Amino acid sequence: MLTVNSYFDESVKSIGFEQNKNAISVGVMLPGSYTFGTNAAEKMTVVTGSLTIKRSSDADWVTFSSGEFFSVEGSSSFDVNVEIETAYLCEYL
């Protein structure tokens, strides 16, 4: 089953599904600045484009480009700056 979600006035859209009992979502972010909250830990992979993020544990902003990934702790939040349309894969750990 697919679950479609929209966030931030439709500037971020994702499609969620399960694979081998693991929750996954794929989506696209339009240019902008966003703050996401997490319930579970997440592994975010940039499919195309780039994401500049700042987790609470980060001293500075860090940019991740196509093919790179970062992890976010559960029950936390992270800030994202997007300069170009960016596709991502989110695996819930």
Curated annotation (Swiss-Prot):
This is Pyrimidine/purine nucleoside phosphorylase. Belongs to the nucleoside phosphorylase PpnP family. PANTHER family: PYRIMIDINE/PURINE NUCLEOSIDE PHOSPHORYLASE (PTHR36540), PYRIMIDINE_PURINE NUCLEOSIDE PHOSPHORYLASE (PTHR36540:SF1). Catalyzes the phosphorolysis of diverse nucleosides, yielding D-ribose 1-phosphate and the respective free bases. Can use uridine, adenosine, guanosine, cytidine, thymidine, inosine and xanthosine as substrates. Also catalyzes the reverse reactions. One of its GO terms (cellular component) is cytosol. Its EC number is 2.4.2.1, 2.4.2.2. InterPro entries: Ppnp, RmlC-like_jellyroll, RmlC_Cupin_sf. GO terms for molecular function: guanosine phosphorylase activity; purine-nucleoside phosphorylase activity; thymidine phosphorylase activity; uridine phosphorylase activity. The keyword Transferase applies. Signal peptide: none annotated. Pfam families: Ppnp (PF06865). It catalyses: a purine D-ribonucleoside + phosphate = a purine nucleobase + alpha-D-ribose 1-phosphate; adenosine + phosphate = alpha-D-ribose 1-phosphate + adenine; cytidine + phosphate = cytosine + alpha-D-ribose 1-phosphate; guanosine + phosphate = alpha-D-ribose 1-phosphate + guanine. The gene is ppnP. It comes from the Bacteria. Keywords: Glycosyltransferase, Transferase.
